Amino acid sequence: MLESVSPPHLFAVMLSRVHAVCEALAAEGALPAGIDLARIVVEPPKDASHGDMATNAAMVLAKEAKAKPRDLAEKIAEKLRADDLVAAVEVAGPGFINLTLQPKVWSEALRTVLADGAGYGRSAVGAGEKVNVEYVSANPTGPMHVGHCRGAVFGDALASLLDFAGYDVTREYYINDAGAQVDVLARSALLRTREALGEEIGEIPEGLYPGDYLKPVGEALAAEYGDKLLAMDEAEWLPIARAKSIAMMMQMIRGDLAALNITHEEFFSERSLIAGDTDRVAATIDFLRGKGDVYEGRLPPPKGAPIEDYEDREQTLFRATAYGDDVDRPLLKSDGSYTYFASDIAYHKTKFDRGFRNMIDVWGSDHGGYIKRVQAAIKAVTGGQGALDVKIVQLVKLLRNGEPVKMSKRSGDFVTLREVVDEVGSDAVRFMMLFRKNDAVLDFDLAKVIEQSKDNAVFYVQYGHARGHSVFRNAREVVPDLPEETVARAAFLADAAVERLTDTAELGLLRQLALYPRIVEAAALAHEPHRIAFYLYELASEFHALWTRGRDLPHLRFIINNDAEITKARLALVQGAVSVLASGLAVLGVHAPDEMR
């Protein structure tokens, strides 16, 4: 959680004033005493010509007040007209209230941006609440591929956003190292060990992992054990090959993630759930059985689509239907081993036991059908105190100039994350993976994400930041004392006559800057980091539009040679823009360059 936050942002201030008006009306008898104000919002109007802000207060209170929405809106509007921040109030449509704010509001908003610096937009909305964000959690069977990339970026950006909004965030990776796939990995590594010892292995047999990335594992095993490994029984060599393979795969995965500036505080091993003397899966099943949530029974035959793990036999079942799932779920396979779901229940219980009431899992699109059962399990093991939000990330279609990209030779059958990052850079990957809502399929074109055009969002936003710094460099002829260092420059510009910023384009940029804290809070509460990316593109658009306007109309240029006062005011506006661009890019894990090369 962050140590300091901005003061209440402008939209929060106006919301509190709308609340105060409604409370005053209640005191006068125009509204019921104690009326619920929680559904009132103050937000930007859909059409900018309707004003600076709009509120639904009359619309959501009218029914309880037994009044017509428009009549109630007129009463609220009458009181809002007396507010010192409000220049005009208009009742529109069935009862919406549009507000136009006084010009001084925007000047003060810019001064707040300059004063808060990198802290502008930070929020206390999280109130220090602990939240566990689990993302990536790829099987430790090979390098990260482009399909993992989107979930990795999304989870990392979401964790940063929540931290910025005042939550106490833990970033976690669940290592799936207890399933059959790691035994296949071990057998694949043994084959590569034989190869490293000089044996001709020919074509990789079907069912084993074919990628060349396993050659170093075989070489490491050969160097450590020589041909002793080949003389062992499977029961002896399998754990050795498995442990070495998992360790080296996780080292590779961490390196792949580091190339995207992605880190985790916790790496939780699935195998640790059943390691040693404590079987936490069995303990969790016993715990649920004691609550009456586990029983021995037979599932009815599935109707329509087959139910995963369905077996027509008496078996151990979790009573998932009692917690909102469609069917009860098996916990043990016919051979007595745990289902993956059973391990998943135990794993999520450890999160709760570690103090996390708020859990977020980032899953691939093929796991959508798994959500209900895990949410049901969390309700059961936490007594309803734990909450899980599952964010599904859809597929990424990798293209080059509109054509599908061929597979990787190194990996065997997929394009690796590292190949993509090496080609276009981590900034392009991160920003463009976030420039579309997570549950929509993403076309990622390797050629287009490095274009220098408005159509390339990451370039357009970064160029806005770099263009702002070019203004500072050029301004020193008119304002020779302008500091180079960011904090010192903001302090120097704090006394600028920003009330002189009255042009339409200048006011548009000021309004956009004032919107940032609200965007941060809304994005954090919705668990949607793409909102930050969208906002940054709009902010960059406003800044570029202002720059273009100054090019076409010389009196609106940032630097006016014979007017140091307006130059300093516009430099303050540029400082506000680059500060917020840098802040938003930092939340997304993208660099904010001072120059574009």
From Swiss-Prot:
GO terms for molecular function: arginine-tRNA ligase activity; ATP binding. It is an enzyme of class 6 (ligase). It comes from the Bacteria. Keywords: Aminoacyl-tRNA synthetase, ATP-binding, Cytoplasm, Ligase, Nucleotide-binding, Protein biosynthesis. It catalyses: tRNA(Arg) + L-arginine + ATP = L-arginyl-tRNA(Arg) + AMP + diphosphate. GO terms for cellular component: cytoplasm. It is found in: Cytoplasm. Its EC number is 6.1.1.19. A motif ('HIGH' region) lies at residues 138-148. Its main location: cytoplasm. Belongs to the class-I aminoacyl-tRNA synthetase family. Monomer. This is Arginine--tRNA ligase. The gene is argS.
